[in-house]
Amino acid sequence: MANPLYHKHIISINDLSREDLELVLRTAASLKANPQPELLKHKVIASCFFEASTRTRLSFETSMHRLGASVVGFADGSNTSLGKKGETLADTISVIGTYVDAIVMRHPQEGAARLATEFSGGIPVLNAGDGANQHPTQTLLDLFTIQETQGRLNNINIAMVGDLKYGRTVHSLAQALAKFEGNRFFFIAPDALAMPAYILQMLEEKGIQYSLHSSIEEVVPELDILYMTRVQKERLDPSEYANVKAQFVLRAADLAGARDNLKVLHPLPRIDEITTDVDKTPYAYYFQQAGNGIFARQALLALVLNADLAL
């Protein structure tokens, strides 16, 4: 069967159907079990990070190397011609597109990744995060981790906690889980950082249950997944940040009464919203979650760059 993701831009999780998501997750599981060190041996991939990143950039570049690809790019957009000389993003991408087989890009401006697709010369663009908008590859590793720990992606009770306004990971994850039946969402956030109305409207239109809460402890006994997020300091003014940064903090004691299968996830970096005593509980799974980024991103790269992928 032809691979539906071959040469496809991956900008939003909505670019992927449920069937596409399931294909990526099957491929990720296969690559985790059976490494393919020469799968992308003759490919060159650009890693273009116009915004700071640790886990996403390193896991993407590790994924590229472990599949045998050559990697070019930069980790700081301020040192490029765009940053130093005022070149437009359109011109930068137009040139990079002539050098490589795929472009992985992070940019602080919402919509930048979608814009890049118009100037890449048909070279596929993979969004590694654009402002507060979308982070589809984080969602793929989140889905992979949920499936790995729960054995399913349907009938999941998931709480999302913290900065639900600017946290692009929760926007993408809510949209992805809405493609699977029976999932229920519990949203816990300061009023100023509540889940955007368009996400709530999407859930309502699909008939998906959600509820708003003011504490973590009140919902813990009902949860399969507790998804913590940090407050996005870089997107708030200092006074706003001071008011909300410590409003929701998870401590080990808060997990009393949790189901045995509960896993605590976090896209990282963690600041102080999960205390270190949680790390020692059987519920903590955020470091393993980060490790799964390798396999989810390998799967996406493999599918986008291979017309007929059979693993």
Curated annotation (Swiss-Prot):
The keyword Transferase applies. Pathway: Pyrimidine metabolism; UMP biosynthesis via de novo pathway; (S)-dihydroorotate from bicarbonate: step 2/3. GO terms for cellular component: cytosol. L-aspartate binds at K85, R168, R230. One of its GO terms (molecular function) is aspartate carbamoyltransferase activity. Heterododecamer (2C3:3R2) of six catalytic PyrB chains organized as two trimers (C3), and six regulatory PyrI chains organized as three dimers (R2). This is Aspartate carbamoyltransferase catalytic subunit. It comes from Serratia proteamaculans (strain 568).
